[in-house]
Amino acid sequence: MAFRMSEQPRTIKIYNLLAGTNEFIGEGDAYIPPHTGLPANSTDIAPPDIPAGFVAVFNSDEASWHLVEDHRGKTVYDVASGDALFISELGPLPENFTWLSPGGEYQKWNGTAWVKDTEAEKLFRIREAEETKKSLMQVASEHIAPLQDAADLEIATKEETSLLEAWKKYRVLLNRVDTSTAPDIEWPAVPVME
């Protein structure tokens, strides 16, 4: 029944609501002076029994309670990316999310569980090897440039000529590295001064 004002003071049982969500947060007795209404964020309509994992939310327009799923404070995982999402609002579990955490890197969702995504891992290892190769090629070129200058100017020492040849050989061998075999790559040895 809906609340009605009275000419008499009275004490009634009220059900308190959280401002913003109107979820049930407790009950208590409230003193109602004559010609006044209910305290803010409360109702005199009792909530239904609330099962675990739900909260009762009061709809003021309909003057009725609704049960709403409550997963706040929990973490779910996007089945497309594996990214974690911290639930901070009332409502059902978002679509395309699961409670199951991916068990490490390179996981994909198969509809019921996370499984190793060997293709994604392989692609990552290839990209990683390509970056390593590019970086090593740059280092080799940086070593070769001044040695090549000395050779071009015919002022290279025996040691510089030997190093130039070693770095050029290294760069050629490095260029031949097939990154598609990553992570099983045998990188050529970096030349060292003797």
Swiss-Prot record:
Question: Chaperone: is it a keyword of this entry?
Answer: yes
Q: What is this protein called?
A: Tail fiber assembly protein
Biological role stated in the UniProt entry: Chaperone that acts in assembly of the long tail fibers.
This protein's assembly is summarised as: Homodimer.
Database matches in Pfam families: Caudo_TAP
Query: Record's family?
Result: Belongs to the tfa family.
This protein's source sits in the domain of life called Viruses
Q: What is the lineage of its organism?
A: Viruses, Duplodnaviria, Heunggongvirae, Uroviricota, Caudoviricetes
Q: Which organism is it from?
A: Escherichia phage lambda
Q: Which InterPro entries match?
A: Phage_T4_Gp38_tail_assem, TFA_Chaperone
Keywords per UniProt: Chaperone, Viral release from host cell, Viral tail assembly, Viral tail fiber assembly
Kindly state a single biological-process term from the GO annotations of this entry.
virus tail fiber assembly
